[in-house]
UniProtKB/Swiss-Prot annotation:
Function, in words: Involved in ubiquitin-mediated protein degradation. Regulatory factor in the ubiquitin/proteasome pathway that controls the turnover of proteasome substrates. Targets proteasomes to the nucleus and facilitates the degradation of nuclear proteins.
Natural source organism: Arthroderma gypseum (strain ATCC MYA-4604 / CBS 118893) (Microsporum gypseum)
This protein's name: Tethering factor for nuclear proteasome STS1
Cysteine-cysteine disulfides: none
Subunit: Binds the proteasome.
Pfam family for this entry, one: Cut8
Key words of the record: Cytoplasm, Nucleus, Protein transport, Transport
Ranges for region Disordered: 25-85
Length: 314
């Protein structure tokens, strides 16, 4: 009674078609891929072609604006030319520049006058430096070995000694009154210049020492002039509190008493100020221990203490 519904069998041609269709589709797919790859390979360029061909997709480079360069145009004809005055003066040392300036002043007196009014006043240190340079040149010109005070040595250094003494005679009046109004400046110069005279050589032949003695004499006169002028300025405070009495006494001792006139002038100037009071060794000195100068009495407030005080009409 049971009835079985039988599934109709699959026709044989269906299996053949299905299997063939799967294999066919795979083979056709592989064939199309192979054909595509072959076409792409045919279209790809070779290595030589890629290296020789310029890139087509490279970005374009935009030129950047450059700053203008200011270059001197070269001269069409190169020729020699002298230096300009500023460049020429840069190559001159002190001695060469001094020589050129001296030559111009000698040929053009008006330039010499302008230089005299334009150049700054030489300081004491600058003047003493020049004199010390002459002194160094003199010392270095002595012959090696032998007697440095002999006539042979004197003849060897005579010109350098003359140059030093001439420079000393030229510089000294510049620092004396009335050309120099400051006593301190004059005294400082004389102090240094006297030291230079002390260092001058002493010769065996007495005649050769006359130049040094003459320099001491001129220096003593210069000391006297400056001391007199300093005593008039400010009551001689510069002389009293500058220690110049001791300095000048030492110079006189080193010079062998050739500055005694200057020492006497200083003692006389300090006498009315109050220096050397009670010392009978200087002219005009007082022997009274209680004698005081008018200046000291004024400064201590004792001036006129022993005088009667008058009241009322004179």
């Amino acid at each position: 009674m049971n009835s079985l519904v039988a599934t109709p069998p699959v026709p044989p041609h269906f299996y053949e078609t299905s299997c063939r269709s799967a294999s066919y589709s795979m083979s056709s797919t592989n064939a199309s891929v192979n054909r595509k790859r072959k076409a792409e390979d045919d279209c790809l360029p070779s290595d030589d072609t890629r290296m020789s061909a310029s890139p087509s997709g490279s970005p374009a480079l935009h030129p950047r604006p450059l700053a203008p360069r200011h270059l001197k145009r070269s001269r069409p004809n190169v020729s020699g030319r002298p230096l300009s005055l500023p460049r020429l003066m840069e190559t001159l040392d002190t001695d060469a520049l001094r020589s050129v300036l001296r030559s111009l002043c000698d040929r053009h007196p008006e330039i010499a006058s302008e230089v005299m009014h334009t150049a700054p006043r030489p300081s004491v240190s600058a003047a003493l430096e020049v004199l010390n340079n002459y002194q160094s040149t003199l010392q270095s010109s002595f012959p090696l070995g032998g007697n440095p005070s002999s006539d042979y040595a004197y003849n060897r250094v005579r010109q350098h000694l003359t140059n030093l003494l001439e420079a000393l005679n030229d510089f000294t009046p510049h620092f004396l009154p009335p050309n120099e109004s400051q006593p301190s400046t004059s005294l400082n110069y004389l102090d240094g210049a006297t030291d230079i005279i002390h260092r001058l050589p002493r010769w065996t032949t007495p005649q050769h020492n006359l130049e040094k003695y003459a320099a001491y004499e001129e220096m003593s006169k210069a000391w006297c002039l400056v001391i007199r002028e300093a005593a008039k300025r400010g009551g001689g405070i510069q002389l009293q509190y500058g220690g110049w009495d001791q300095k000048l006494a030492k110079h006189n001792e080193t010079a062998g008493g050739k500055l005694q006139d200057a020492v006497n002038e200083l003692n006389q100037s300090l006498g009315w100020i109050g220096g050397n009071v009670g010392n009978p060794s200087y002219p005009g000195g007082s022997n009274s221990q209680g004698d005081m100068s008018i200046r000291q009495q004024l400064m201590s407030g004792t001036y006129g203490a022993g005088l009667p005080l008058k009241v009322g009409p004179w």
